[in-house]
């Protein structure tokens, strides 16, 4: 008999990722079941894509394209309109292929004689074979038919996504939906207007799927976890549909976006769609909320919960201990269609593909961050500041349970930065218990990762790591309290690479006081790290100052002045600032990203870094052998 006579449905709202479920519902469902609550889950993000990218979905899309006036036609919609029957004839087979259900189709896809090719395929013309042979041979060789076909299939699906965006809903992307309506949006008005507007093809599809989920699960409570701004609009559209069809169902909003951006929520209209909004770790607030719905706890005793009373937003927080990380239970993917996710190959880079290819079980080694000092990070918030680790025994118990349930042995450790001590213990436990898995995750490039430890991690199944090199400048790394140096990062990343572990570097530009010279020097350092085989992949992030970060809380310490925020009743996170250096970081970012894209394809590693910029920049001051010397001295 359940402790609570309620039925909780946790929903993944569009859009997150396509190759594997976003883990929030698996975590919540596993926890609630461990406490005796009837809990189920549904991935409407995947559902929307599978409905739209089907023969029936393309027939609907074709109608949208036909209704476009000639002046609104784009290269994408024109290419699609010229051969809709070829798209309709191939879409279901391509989806089956990227789901892993029809591997022999790879030969036909790779031939380039079967799929209709839209503008996305133009990128293949950039690859030139000097001998006039296969321009993609450098990436796939003679036998890489499956990967070649997966890349072609991804281009094909991206073409259709472009048509969907141009003809049916300009807000649609595979990994985000209507993001601008929520990100640091001080007023709820843009979102309210979008929710009141006529439904698009994507909206109608989402409404149909929501109705089907309600009929299937018959929930009394629906939890919508929104990790990113690009999931918020869809979550509100789902809640709107629920309140139209079943106003008796309690709707609850939570997740990473709420935790970072809605902490000062005062907009009553949010509660036209959601009965409650909870902050930070969801376990304790949900337990108190379920008790309240049972009549066993008064509203005054809720935990970290917003609600509307007498037309005004009220925040209620009875301080109670959070559920220890060791007691949150094992995530469960029960109820999610694990054989229906799409493994895609966008970037021809072995490390970068991990984010879009493969059905990875998500697992957290520890709650929060053990370092929690970085100046750009939201270190004042619970998801960073409350560090709570589980033992290696507990983690491997969870791993074994997840493998038994899913039949999948790949794990993505989704910590902000997994602690070296915990990873060492995890590796030892995996090896001692002879648990064979593949795993990868986020770390800090600190000196604790010795060559010996890196090899131990590889022996336990570690295939890749990602970590922050950020600005690649010792002065700026010290200013941001990163706790590493460039030379240290070089030695640690090389230790991982030498152990056969792929390395991805998170890179940053536009940090306070960063000059053009600093930026050019950083790119030269990154070039050397690629050339030395220390890193195989990277991504440049434009620094954004948030109100919860040390920079946002004490801007004078970083030499910048914050611009006043408008009145906020909805979302608050990013805050603009004035940096006296006056550098045009956006212009520099174009060159940085161009260089990195080429480095990840093994191109331009000997070129002067100034060649990547469209305007004059100073010569790099970094010695061309800086990284080589650091590795030799290590």
Regions found by a protein language model. Name each.
Residues 2-13, 33-34, 52-173, 191, ...:
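Radical SAM enzyme core and accessory elements
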Residues 4, 191-194, 312-362:
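N-terminal [4Fe-4S]-dependent radical SAM core
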Residues 8-16, 248, 396-502, 509-511:
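Conserved SAM/AdoMet-binding glycine-rich loop
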Residues 15-18, 23-57, 69, 89, ...:
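Glycine-rich beta-alpha loop elements in corrinoid/cobalamin-binding modules
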Residues 41-53, 258-263, 423, 475-480, ...:
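Flexible glycine/acidic-rich beta-alpha junction loops that bind and position SAM and/or redox cofactors
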Residues 215, 269-270, 403-404, 458, ...:
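Non-catalytic positions within long, well-ordered alpha-helices that form the structural scaffold/packing
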Residues 265, 513-528:
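Catalytic cores of alpha/beta
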Residues 355-393:
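Canonical Radical SAM [4Fe-4S] cluster-binding loop centered on the CxxxCxxC motif
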